[in-house]
Amino acid sequence: MTYIENVFVCMAAPLVVALLSLKRGHRAALVFCLAGMGACLLSAYLNTFFARLYQADAVNAATQIAPVVEEIMKLLPLLFFLAVFEPAFARFRLAAVIVAASFATFENICFLTQNGADQILFLLIRGFGTGAMHVVCGNVYGGALRPVWDSRPLRAACLFALLCVAIIYHATYNLLVSAGGTPQLIAYFVPLPTALCFRLLARKAGE
């Protein structure tokens, strides 16, 4: 049995200490790291709760429950940041990527502690695949929001639409991974090129 809250404490402790030693203007990145890991921790509890509530098996939980719960949990700290601080678009986009990357990092570490570290090739493939998938889901809030950033109604509508896109992408990834064999390999391969495409589009847009 893996006590993920203990893993969270071990990872969060040095970040909290670092927060205390930094000036206010330099703390944002660490705060979003903590938010991403906290979202992952809470998602694990919520996934378990809803899986038991709906009596879902492993495949249904991974493809129907986890994508919705995890993408909503990743978006919540971003919505708080947006509502309270009204950040510029570039800062919001950076926050989205940091939350997604720290979420994936915590998830990978929990997977590592639960399954061991003896299969390095599989861990690399899964680490880059799942990590890139979460980063891609964080990146969907990038270029699509820029044209409507100054309009609150359009921004809210786009945020909901992009959340749905992230959920569908996440669910498709989980479905392919659950299928095993060739579909699983495709799932592990696709997110990294997708993340690179996002980067190329951002560079083309001058971000």
Where are these regions (language model features)?
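Hydrophobic alpha-helical segments at protein termini of multi-pass membrane proteins
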Residues: 1-207
